[in-house]
Amino acid sequence: MEPKETLRQRWPGRGRTEETGAMKKSDDAPAVMTVEHLNMYYGSFMALKDVSMVIRKNRITALIGPSGCGKSTFIRSLNRMHEIVPGARVEGRVTLDGEDIYAPEVDPVRVRRRVGMVFQKPNPFPTMSIYDNVIAGLKLGRKRKKSELDEIVERTLRQAALWDEVKNKLSESGTSLSGGQQQRLCIARTLALEPEVILMDEPASALDPVSTQKIEDAMLELKEQYTVVIVTHNMQQAARVSDYTGFFFIEDMGQPGQLWEFGETEKIFSNPDRKETEDYVTGRFG
């Protein structure tokens, strides 16, 4: 195993430094979501096996691991988005503020409002303006005054680090924006619903370095008010922005994905407990 200092130098963190409000050595942030012994199936195929995890409030949790190990499947279980796939089902328990999100009386639409999702590929509504893209989800609820909608649009675009770039062209199509701007527009659209948790499935994988930096900066700002869970293949990104990291792994092709190791990001990247974790974060496979 490499010396600890070498691993730390390889993965300098940005999200946990004193300048950004460091995480305490003993984190006392409350749990906002708890996953207990989660198994997930698509038909008869077991995609995830026995995953347990605590997701803490106002923290960024990164999910890493090789392709096909269940990261995106897992993140979709956190707001029941996987249920749009025929034959998908879960065993185990997932709670949000102590409430089982899979309880029979729980409306999955309500879960998805409380746990928002930003997908890998930006997906602004092509027939809508930038303004209308932001408030699209609000149109399904109570009627709001124009002044209230204006405030929501400005606030969420500021939170997504996009306001200054679009404030003079809110009536233009959302698809007129660059890829990075479109992704930040999708973040603003998610924020307009005032979720407690924001899920991001490789939100910067298709973006250039400048756009990626803006997404990361936005994430670090967002965790002051929200809890963020991000799937990423970018080890530098996970090390820079996250407080906690979960490493997913499959032992062999056709086997279910498992949460191989979970803990504070500093430890996962500098002194992991399992050899497979070290091999992955140091680039020996994956």
From Swiss-Prot:
Residues 33-281 form the ABC transporter domain. The keyword ATP-binding applies. Its main location: membrane. One of its GO terms (cellular component) is plasma membrane. It is a peripheral membrane protein. It is an enzyme of class 7 (translocase). It is found in: Cell membrane. Belongs to the ABC transporter superfamily. Phosphate importer (TC 3.A.1.7) family. This is Phosphate import ATP-binding protein PstB. It comes from Rubrobacter xylanophilus (strain DSM 9941 / JCM 11954 / NBRC 16129 / PRD-1). The lineage of its organism: Bacteria, Bacillati, Actinomycetota, Rubrobacteria, Rubrobacterales. The gene is pstB.
